[in-house]
Amino acid sequence: MDSINKCESHTPMMQQYLRLKSEHPEVFLFYRMGDFYELFYDDAKRASRLLDISLTQRGQSAGTPIPMAGVPYHVIDNYLAKLVQLGESAAICEQVGDPSTSKGPVERKVVRIVTPGTISDEALLQEKQDNLLAAVWQDKQGLGYATLDISSGRFRAMEPKDLEALKTELQRTHPSELLYPETFELIDLIESRQGLRRRPLWEFELETARQQLNLQFGTQDLTGFGVEQAHLALRAAGCLLQYVKDTQRTSLPHIRELILQHEEDNVTIDAASRRNLELTENLSGGTENTLASILDCTVTSMGSRMLKRWLHMPITDMSTLHHRQEAIRVLQHVASDLKPLLRKVGDLERILARLALRTARPRDLARMRLAFEQLPEIHDVLNTCKSQHLKKLLSEIGQFDALLDLLRRAIVDVPPVLIRDGGVIATGYNEELDKWRALSDGAHDYLNELEIRERHELKLDTLKVGFNAIHGYYIQVSRAQSHLIPAHYARRQTLKNVERYIIPELKEYEDKVLTSKGKALSIEKDLYEEIFDLLLPHIASLQTSSTALAELDVLSNLAERADTLNYVCPVLTEKSVIEITGGRHPVVEQVSKQPFIANPISLSPERRMLIITGPNMGGKSTYMRQTALIVLLAHIGSFVPADKAIIGSVDRIFTRIGAADDLASGRSTFMVEMTETANILHNATEKSLVLMDEIGRGTSTYDGLSLAWACAENLSIHIKSMTLFATHYFELTSLPEKINGIVNVHLQALEQGDEIAFMHSVHEGAASKSYGLAVAALAGVPKKVIDRARQRLEELEFTLEENGHTKPSLPASKPVFEKESTDHPVIRKLKTLKPDTMTPYDALQWIYYLQKMF
């Protein structure tokens, strides 16, 4: 590496490369050389491995072979996509000087830096998924977190109240790139993420952040955005903006505001609950059989992204929810007319971001034109609708007749992919361009006339006029007739059977045509930039329009889904109540081959907790999840899968359902479950919906039962949350007798011989048995094992009954974990004994039995 750093020992070109590389040491440097982007030294070695491209050498520099790898310029996006997916970044270095006037290496400079969180190119983005850049700040005062979607301009900040809240936000936003300060102490929280960027402390300075943000928004202070006093959030937001400016190296007019998020505005769903509910990602990491897979039939990518944001951030504002419900109800009558129009609108949101960054391609402008053409018809469809919310959306959508006229006049119907290909600007838009094009386009007629004239004058029937990319224009004659050509014909190329010539007249025309093509392309590029200048003053209203169009797509999609899937409009209330008649699981009912059994649920202050019993595979988890999903759907304004629903306002949705070992963190299944349970007990309120499934499994019977009992007590007596508590501890079914507000329900099953039929229907009261052996048989456990288990079960039950011993029962009035409790299990056992009737052998057996309890 020492020889690399001694630039004077290298060739001028390598000196230029090394100087540029020293300015960007942590990213790949793609160095433009002709038709290739080249990488050298360590960049070449790593790129060869990551991108599966050939590693070669480019001679020697300072006596050392130079490792080199390269990719053709026209497929650079494909390789950049691979890199950003791996969390890598790349600096793109272009030739900006004129080779004909350059002394030494052509001038080059880095024109942009492509990072996972700052990409806007269509080829690099997932079309139906937000791509976020995030920054996190931590100090003694607390935490700050900010996100920016550069492909839309959406800029958000918040101040998580604790570590768990930050963890929830990281899981919800899932940033592609995360910036953190040198002093950040919570490395364990982020170290497993890709795209981590350690940034200098000064980028998070509060005053620097204020200056950056005010400069971006053209304001004197940030009071109007409501973030002036949010110091922790501002630090994170300031670092984000600085980083984006450094990487994009252009103005960012589409980033127009910073919105401060408040926890109370949304229904909080922690990381574990979000995973368990499978909103947009299933437990295997895929997208199949998720809520989004059923609900998302949007026709624009920006609508799909907005719907997913709604699912991950349900809201609590009743006014907004009622407006959405009203709009959906109206759109049920016109959704079929709207969808074809919205489909042609396309991804206007991201097109506008590329316009703002001045990276929009010709086809982006053509798609923008197509979107504008749909707006009058969208207005026609919705003008008669009485929904106030739809009227508001229509006013925000607007119409852009002047811009539509500009794009119709300026851009050809089907433009090429890139402006450098030429042929983008329509004929008639610019007189000078048309003049130069006419000269170039007239070449065909001129060459035909020249060929006819020369063939006639020279009487050479094999004479032809043509063009070659290397040698230019030529007059071709067969070798057999070549002796007949006149003296002013100058030989240009000799082939096997023909000779090619040039004459002064053709050479003069060639120079004129080639000049005209270059001139026409130069004018086109200038006109293309002028079109940007004409469009950009409207970027604010265009962004408002695209956001409204995306919401219209979401609402019309929810209207169609409500019709197709037989959803009903829930009644929303501020009370702590959930009353659902004929509730269904939105995903299971669509993917199951069996008819789905709908079930009711009733939760209220007088009926706070349901103790749910029944067999495994009986439907307990489905019943619990469907309740949470129905409540979630109601809090995005959607209709819900039920016959009737009254949904009260909730502040949080917690689920403790299923778990697996966290091997990376060294945590057992039981530890994972207890961690999730602790989070619920610390953060749930009486306005929370809590789903608890099989608390206490994974440890001894008494430990597990004690934990389950204490959790149920705490949730019902102290927290008073609306709780669904599924369990196999039948002792818990006695809780309704001890605590008001707890009710038993069970999932019904029918057993006949060795077979069991799950009815999947919910009934009041506790289950009579667990059906564990029947479920084991259904799972394929060998019959001889089942028979032995049944025999052993009968023996155990007989032994307990014979000795007057029943299953343990825990009273609600005593703290379960009190060390000096007189109700210790051993004491309870001893109290059941009758020493006067026991033989010495019986007494010895009891001692052994008591030993096994420990």
Curated annotation (Swiss-Prot):
Q: Which UniProt keywords apply?
A: ATP-binding, DNA damage, DNA repair, DNA-binding, Nucleotide-binding
Record-annotated residues binding ATP?
A: G614, P615, N616, M617, G618, G619, K620, S621
Q: Does the keyword Nucleotide-binding apply?
A: yes
Q: Name one Pfam family in it.
A: MutS_V
Q: Does the keyword NADP apply?
A: no
Instruction: Tell me the SMART domains matching this sequence.
Output: MUTSac, MUTSd
PROSITE patterns hit by this protein: DNA_MISMATCH_REPAIR_2 (PS00486)
| Family (UniProt) | Belongs to the DNA mismatch repair MutS family.
Protein name per Swiss-Prot or TrEMBL: DNA mismatch repair protein MutS
The UniProt gene name for this protein comes to: mutS
